[in-house]
């Protein structure tokens, strides 16, 4: 069987001594230990081998493992790249265009850092619901949202999941961005522009990943859940992300799509195939099976699923 263990990473940094010790990420020392573990127990392969398996059906080595890094964080150039190069390992990086080229902070990152700076998430839920109420949302609708979305998962408690869902997907875009920015100002207390410059890689740093032999693929342009936007908007977003890849010197033939939030629909799959993608990766839980899975919707495991 052609199985592939795809590992997902986001924040990788010395967290305890950082400005945001409450952020949910992987400590640098834990990353080093995890690389040692994976290198010993798996065969870490490069993206070219993954693409060859998807395009040509070539066999993957036993216990093949592929390291993937989402969202374009400065952590990836500052901390991850040196560790990979030191071990002669390969990684695949998926930065969204706007995070690298524009002075913005992705909605998800606003929410992550708000949560990292809040002592009591239940109080944050209370404030969020008050903001919704002030915006004209009825108590019955708020209660319905809470009942539907306040469900714990393997990473977060119920209240945290509720805040993430409401501020990343459920509320209307303008309202959720307004609330997130107000909460960011209140709890994080730094300017969005300065925060963006510090959080994400620069264009030159992404180019350095490519020059260092790493793979850079698409994570969309605006980091939107693609299944929530029209086919025309999806087309535009995917094309802009490919233009960005070309701009940083990354391949745009047989490229890899990493869906923002793991979200896609049939239109998305059709578009990425039309634009020449070789495969797509999601946030669905599991080890990828190249003989049975949809190659444009492969599952991944999380760094938290392995020793650190």
Identify what each model region corresponds to.
Residues 70-72, 77, 87, 92:
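Conserved beta-strand->loop/alpha-helix structural units within folded catalytic cores of enzymes
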Residues 7, 13, 64, 85-263, ...:
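Metal-dependent polysaccharide deacetylase catalytic core of the NodB/CE4 family, i.e.
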Residues 1-68, 75, 106-115, 211, ...:
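C-terminal active-site subregion of NodB/CE4 polysaccharide deacetylases
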